[in-house]
Regions:
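Short amphipathic, positively biased membrane-proximal segments
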Residues: 1-383
Length: 383
């Protein structure tokens, strides 16, 4: 196992036991900074939105790199310090426990028959207009949000942490937050948020596919999950939410999608897993449990994959080093052979010769040939 795997495991454990950091949450601080920069940069143009996205996401990744370097410097390269630094960032980025807590709070309000309270808490999970939703609509919105945020707030972060360490964690969370802030089709953000939405689609792709695959493996109905994923994922307007929501719908045996309302706008989305039944309040808890299983499996998969990738990289580096050493040894061997050939042979005269006899002439010609041949040989051998 390597630093990223240990750090991710400790961060996941901290999120499970402690939940979100609370006051001074880095993601909330990033959101305030991104909103302030948006007020200064906003123009109804894609280029300005791209500048905003690069500045915010790139800045977050750079800060993550600085944090990682500072922790390593403070710990003088100690592995335990590096793991702790990774764990702190993973804890602040992962949101599985907060997601489960908010989903269960809505479920508790529905169980108590308090639809108004359930509607009041729903915006903490998603951007739907809650006042147009009945109890079934609220429950469906929660299940869809649990599915999508399992990918965004848990699995995707673990994937990028395994790939790029602290900069990957910070950068992915920044991209995901920007998409939630500006990556939608409101009049203000239709053009300005285009870059954030496209970057989020690209960054979220590996995590969403892994989430869907793990939902198939961990869900109560693997065949139904796989069937819904194959049949309905491409019908969803989001390339990443589609596979995840479809797989969750099939795994839980419920219908998702349909008519939605966002900020006064009504959207009619295709139904996911049409053979399933309508969502009930009790399906919220089932979705949360599936989300937790998927998160644990993702932690294991990314940890093993990261360790394997590091081992392969080390093996390739070691093999390259061995190849260089072998070539140097071979070169020295060729040089030594050339030197032996260049010495005095048994049929040659070692002392000074008197007169231009036949032996003297053969020796001179032979020395000239050996001198040219030996030098040329050393040049070709790379010395």
């Amino acid at each position: 196992m390597h630093v990223q795997a240990y750090g991710a495991a400790l961060g996941y454990l901290a999120d499970t036991l402690l939940g979100d950091p609370g006051r001074g949450h880095p993601v909330a601080a990033f959101g305030r900074g991104a909103a302030a920069l948006e007020r200064r940069l906003w123009h109804d143009h894609r280029a300005w939105g791209a500048l905003h996205t690069v500045a915010c996401a790139g800045g977050a990744a750079a800060l993550g790199g600085l944090w990682q370097a500072a922790v390593r410097s403070a710990g003088r390269g100690a592995r335990s310090t590096d793991v702790l630094g990774q764990a702190v960032v993973a804890w602040s980025v992962l949101g599985g426990t907060g997601l489960a807590r908010e989903a269960r709070a809505v479920a508790a309000a529905l169980e108590a028959g308090d639809l108004d309270l359930a509607r009041e808490r729903l915006p903490r999970l998603c951007g739907r207009d809650p006042h147009r939703l009945d109890a079934e609509g609220v429950a469906r919105a929660v299940v869809e949000s649990v599915a999508e945020n399992t990918s965004d707030a848990v699995v995707g972060a673990l994937v990028w942490g395994a790939l790029a360490g602290v900069p990957g964690l910070a950068g992915f969370r920044a991209v995901n937050t920007l998409d939630a802030m500006v990556g939608h089709r409101s009049p203000r953000h239709r053009r300005f948020g285009w870059a954030a939405a496209r970057l989020d689609d690209a960054a979220g792709l590996p995590g969403s596919r892994l989430t869907a695959a793990l939902a198939v493996l961990a869900g109560p109905d693997p065949r139904g999950a796989l069937r819904a994923w194959r049949a309905d994922a491409g019908r969803h307007p989001s390339p990443n939410a589609g596979p995840v929501e479809a797989a969750f719908a099939g795994a839980l045996g419920v219908r998702l999608g349909g008519t939605l309302s966002y900020a006064g706008r009504t959207e009619h989305r295709p139904v996911l897993n049409a053979p399933g039944r309508a969502v009930r309040r009790t399906d919220i808890e089932r979705a949360v449990r599936l989300s937790r299983r998927v998160g644990l499996l993702a932690l294991a998969v990314t940890g093993v994959a990261g360790a394997a990738g590091r081992a392969v990289a080390r093996g390739g580096s070691a093999g390259h080093g061995r190849g260089e050493r072998n070539e140097r040894k071979a070169g020295r061997g060729r040089d030594e052979q050339g030197g032996r050939r260049g010495g005095t042979g048994p049929g040659e005269r070692s002392g000074p010769q008197s007169g231009p006899g036949p032996g003297r002439g053969r020796g001179a010609r032979s020395e000239r040939r050996r001198g040219f041949g030996g030098g040329h040989g050393r040049g070709e051998s790379g010395w």
